[in-house]
Curated annotation (Swiss-Prot):
Cellular-component GO terms for this entry: mitochondrial inner membrane; respiratory chain complex IV
Pathway the protein acts in: Energy metabolism; oxidative phosphorylation
Source organism (scientific name): Pongo abelii (Sumatran orangutan)
Subunit composition and interactions: Component of the cytochrome c oxidase (complex IV, CIV), a multisubunit enzyme composed of 14 subunits. The complex is composed of a catalytic core of 3 subunits MT-CO1, MT-CO2 and MT-CO3, encoded in the mitochondrial DNA, and 11 supernumerary subunits COX4I, COX5A, COX5B, COX6A, COX6B, COX6C, COX7A, COX7B, COX7C, COX8 and NDUFA4, which are encoded in the nuclear genome.
Family statement: Belongs to the cytochrome c oxidase subunit 5B family.
Biological processes annotated in GO: mitochondrial electron transport, cytochrome c to oxygen
UniProt-annotated binding residues for Zn(2+): C91, C93, C113, C116
Function field: Component of the cytochrome c oxidase, the last enzyme in the mitochondrial electron transport chain which drives oxidative phosphorylation. The respiratory chain contains 3 multisubunit complexes succinate dehydrogenase (complex II, CII), ubiquinol-cytochrome c oxidoreductase (cytochrome b-c1 complex, complex III, CIII) and cytochrome c oxidase (complex IV, CIV), that cooperate to transfer electrons derived from NADH and succinate to molecular oxygen, creating an electrochemical gradient over the inner membrane that drives transmembrane transport and the ATP synthase.
Protein name per Swiss-Prot or TrEMBL: Cytochrome c oxidase subunit 5B, mitochondrial
Keywords from the UniProt entry: Acetylation, Membrane, Metal-binding, Mitochondrion, Mitochondrion inner membrane, Transit peptide, Zinc
Modified residues (N6-acetyllysine): K68, K86, K121
CDD domains cross-referenced by the UniProt entry: Cyt_c_Oxidase_Vb
Pfam families from the UniProt entry: COX5B
Molecular functions per Gene Ontology: metal ion binding
Protein encoded by which gene: COX5B
Length: 129
């Protein structure tokens, strides 16, 4: 039994020695011709690349990310972007609620959800293209 373990360890040691170059330093093996596996930033193209570069700058040009939630008070309403003067908004009201309360939000002052009282305000938005 011990001889099998020693033979296995010897084979591993020989394999490790073969992996070293002539100078004794470990030989570096790359998986791709360019020096390794490319990162997501190096491999992305087109729209995906634009979104990744904008995200590094803290921008969200195509509204891919979830909107930042506010406290929903009159002083700090939830901001709803829109390209028109009105937009329909859905409020869940409570975390475990199974229905959505839909209401129209118009440009101007902040408006309240009819059920829970959370405030929403319509803000103008420019299209990315």
């Amino acid at each position: 039994m011990a001889s099998r373990l020693l033979r296995g360890a010897g084979a591993l040691a020989a394999q490790a020695l073969r992996a070293r170059g002539p100078s004794g330093a470990a030989a570096v093996r790359s998986m791709a011709s360019g020096g390794g596996v490319p990162t997501d930033e190096e491999q992305a193209t087109g729209l995906e690349r634009e979104i990744m570069l904008a995200a590094k700058k803290g921008l969200d040009p195509y509204n891919v990310l979830a909107p930042k939630g506010a406290s929903g008070t009159r002083e700090d309403p939830n901001l709803v972007p829109s390209i028109s003067n009105k937009r329909i908004v859905g409020c869940i009201c409570e975390e475990d609620n199974t229905s959505v309360v839909w209401f129209w939000l118009h440009k101007g002052e902040a408006q309240r959800c009819p059920r829970c009282g959370a405030h929403y305000k319509l803000v103008p938005q420019q299209l990315a293209h």
